[in-house]
Amino acid sequence: MDGDYLKALIVFGALLLSMPLSAAQLDLQLGANSRIWQTEELLKHPQVQTLTVKDDVSYKKDMTYRAVPMAALLGGIKPEDHLQAVALDGFAAELAAAPLLNTQGSRAWLAIEDPAHPWPPLSAGKHSAGPFYLVWTDPQAGNISPEQWPFEVASIKRMAPVAERFPALLPDPALKADDPVNQGFALFQKNCLACHRLNGAGDAQFGPDLNIPYSP
């Protein structure tokens, strides 16, 4: 009996792995222009195109995607706005809107995983970067960091800047704008808050708090 049960579990597991991906949805919370996009709708978007990304940050090789320019999806968003892309695993990328709206130089794209043609796993035993992945063409032109390539994206929200949401994180206001402390804070927002919180401040659920319960 135990042997039969084990065989049944193995067969069931194999069936699950062989099942095609199901369609997903992307929640854009943009105020008056909020919308929930389905995979099929995005794959039929009038601006969707086949895009080759050189040396993809997550896959470490050239990748080809069906993708829509982010600027085409961010209706009503202004360059001075602030956005947050939240992934299924709790990664929360803090993104200035201006680079996402670029139509020249570094350009941001939403890559869409087609359930009929799934992407490869990121590594052995892992998921792919889908269902939605923020990718860039010519990222060097805009000094785009790896944290600005969130994958497994579930939602993109317009939010107040980090400094307004978490004022306790702000450096001393008496410091000059070019002070190393302020420069470090800018890097912290861009590179660290995507995964971590600090003293409970931050939205990411991916990595541990950088100071609680232990100060480094």
Language model regions located:
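N-terminal signal peptide c-region/cleavage motif recognized by signal peptidases
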Residues: S18-P20
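Extracytoplasmic/secreted proteins, especially bacterial periplasmic and envelope-associated proteins
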Residues: Y65, P69-A72, D179, Q183, ...
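Electrostatic cytochrome c docking/interface patches
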Residues: V162-L187
